[in-house]
Amino acid sequence: VLGLSHVEKMIAGHGYWTNTPLDYMRAMRENLRDTLQKFSVKFWMTEQCVMSNDEEIGGGGGYDTTMKTALYVARWIHHDLVYANAASWQWWRAIGEDYKDGLLEDFGQETIENGKLSDSRLLWCLGNYSRYIKPNAKRIAIKLSVAESPTGLMASAFRNPDGSIVSVVINYSDREEILKFPHKVNGIYLTNDAAGCKLQSCATNGKCVSVPPKSVVTVVMD
């Protein structure tokens, strides 16, 4: 079907059961990327969610508003965008109850008139990407002064159609990292446990950015 003019040269996939162990998570995505590049086919990650094999965060059972699940999912997003070269990324479910599959927690009222919902850091970590990386953005190279690690620092960068550059940095570690960017920083947006369930705007300091422990930070540049 690749030769049909009305069929997009793209393959869509679901990422379930591909996140552990960590070396496998990266290797299988690189293999997917290399295979699709041979045929000039794009990849979309069209569904992802916490499952029972995600033992690092206790599997899927029980809702979690904290950075534990949010960082875990941010690491997935990073690997899908950087190593699988995904051109699009979608989460499975907007609202959930006693499971880690909802961006919002539903407290289970039986009527639709007066129910209660609560947001999570998972929602806002998704926002670190989706609010600032615009449609048709192109991923560009970024070089860290320290080795990238799935249990430490991970970073990706994108150029939006308007020319602005967005970098999303994940700090999985327990120590602060200070990064210096080559462009003037116009905005810094933080998600961590201390910031609460929101994207917290931070003061800019020239080209230097503080990335707190256990956080996701979006840096917007000229």
Task: List where the protein language model places each region.
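Solvent-exposed beta-hairpin/edge-strand motifs
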Residues: 183-197
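Loop/turn elements at helix/coil->beta-strand transitions in domains of secreted/extracellular proteins
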Residues: 6-9, 38-42, 84-89, 135, ...
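Aromatic/acidic polysaccharide-binding cleft in carbohydrate-active enzymes
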Residues: 42-131, 140-146
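Alpha-helical scaffolding within the catalytic cores
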Residues: 1-2, 25-34, 71-79, 150-153
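C-terminal beta-strand-rich structural cap/linker in extracellular carbohydrate-active enzymes
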Residues: 202-222
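Carbohydrate-binding surface patches
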Residues: 146-184, 214
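Flexible loop/turn segments at secondary-structure boundaries
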Residues: 17-22, 50-55, 96-101, 174-177, ...
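Active-site neighborhood of glycoside hydrolase catalytic domains
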Residues: 1-52
